[in-house]
Amino acid sequence: DTIKHSITTHRGCYGECNFCAIAAHQGRTIRTRSEANILQEAKHFTTLKDFKGIISDVGGPTANMYGFECVKKESLGTCIENKRCVDAHRLCKTMKVDHSRNIQLLKDIRAIPGIKKAFVASGVRYDLITADKKHGYEYLKEMVDHHISGQMKVAPEHTNDEVLHHMGKPGKQTLIDFKAMYDKLNKESGKQQFLTYYLIAAHPGCEEKHMHELKQFTTHELKMNPEQAQVFTPTPGTYSAVMYYTELDPFTKKKIFVEKDQ
């Protein structure tokens, strides 16, 4: 039932978190469905007897990667050297982040007669929102005003910058900046909506002291008490699995701590 009335807008992910295998399964290039095709599916829902007017999700592996790609990658393929579209510190300069198509798509779905709500339940990359200086704020406002069912899913995974580097995730300051933007928009809208954080414990490079740091950060900066965290599980075909097995950073060949005993 969760996915019965949901819409997949695209496939692929160029986030390349070191622990994630989505890029291996679906590719590093975003394959975006046309707006017309997506709207046709949304209109079809309204003809179904069991449809109550609620689309449970409009998204993909990363909801806000819809509608834009690196022009260089689309014509020449992914970079062959060890270069990422999004790394732990910045976006590649040829990746022009643009949420405008996504914004218009969500507006068009809302305008369909018989559609009461269209939620975006898939996770979003908050670093893409903060990087889009032209449309990022507008996209988040659109989400806050119309497309969040009480909570928005984001995946910082950790808050220690050293651990985040090993994960291939953006630094904690990006999360702080995003949360400030999110809180501001919710206050302006008069809504009480929250952020749900995906967190990972015991990733290669993560020591007990880092988990204490995480607890302090979530309490004092995020103003919440995590109820759960996923214990790292090495997934075949990922850099994090290489780190787990070799106890080395595959990019620097430096020794890293790997929790295996407890």
Describe the role of every protein-language-model region.
Residues C13, I38, V154, A229:
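Conserved, mostly hydrophobic/aromatic
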Residues L185-Q192, L214-K215, M243-Y245:
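Eukaryotic scaffolding regions of large macromolecular assemblies
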Residues C20-N37:
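Iron-sulfur (Fe-S) cluster-binding segments and ferredoxin-like electron-carrier domains
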Residues H44-T196, I200-P204:
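Conserved SAM/AdoMet-binding glycine-rich loop
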Residues D1-A21, L39, T46, K52-D57:
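N-terminal pre-triad scaffold of radical SAM enzymes
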Residues K209, K223-P226, V231-Q262:
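C-terminal accessory regions of radical SAM enzymes
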